[in-house]
Amino acid sequence: MSRYTGSIYKKSRRLGFSLLENNKEFNSGKKRTYGPGQHGNKKVKLSNYGQQLVEKQKLMFLYGLNDRQFRRLYRVALGRPGVLTLNLLQVLESRLDSLVYRAGFAPTRRAARQLVNHSHVLVNGKKVNIPSALVEVGSTIALKEKSLEMPLIKNTLNKPADFIELVDKDKKVAKLSRLPERSELPADVNEAYVVEWYNRLM
């Protein structure tokens, strides 16, 4: 399965979940706040399998992953001590593109991914252009000095997440101070269903 590049608004309405994480897709001013298609406004009771699939898709589309990437991260979470469901979310949040977004350096996860892809991001002072790179606690994330004048960056007003320390606001330097707690992560995802899905396959 390749990475989804279509309309975030349509996908959010289909999943009943804000992929932009601000519920903008469901604002009353929009033409439709329900799923696309002829029967998009009808409630359908999902089977256990269907619920597992929906919850997996929520995380895949939220973090911009394909199935192969998601499986790899699931295996990483599986190898860590602790609660698997929380481990999975923490691994997803440890991706470099996710941390660039969480640090408030980009307005969306897609924009954060582009910043990493185009070599605007430093990890511990070294250029890293792989969005999927996993960042360890204590590492610093920064934007290149010449990138700070980009309108995308200058116009981003997002505040950093509580688990990220803003070392230098003007120079866009942040530090992953700790792994996030469950209460700091998307509430509208039931990651237990995702674990059930992969336990069945692996």
Curated annotation (Swiss-Prot):
Residue span, S4 RNA-binding domain: 94-157
Gene Ontology CC: small ribosomal subunit
Database matches in Pfam families: Ribosomal_S4, S4
Gene Ontology annotations of biological process type: ribosomal small subunit biogenesis; translation
Keyword Magnesium: no
Signal peptide start-end: none
Keywords in alphabetical order: Ribonucleoprotein, Ribosomal protein, RNA-binding, rRNA-binding
Gene Ontology terms for molecular function: rRNA binding; structural constituent of ribosome
HAMAP family registered for this protein in UniProt: Ribosomal_uS4_B (MF_01306_B)
Similarity section: Belongs to the universal ribosomal protein uS4 family.
Record text on subunit structure and interactions: Part of the 30S ribosomal subunit. Contacts protein S5. The interaction surface between S4 and S5 is involved in control of translational fidelity.
Function: One of the primary rRNA binding proteins, it binds directly to 16S rRNA where it nucleates assembly of the body of the 30S subunit.
Name by which UniProt lists this protein: Small ribosomal subunit protein uS4
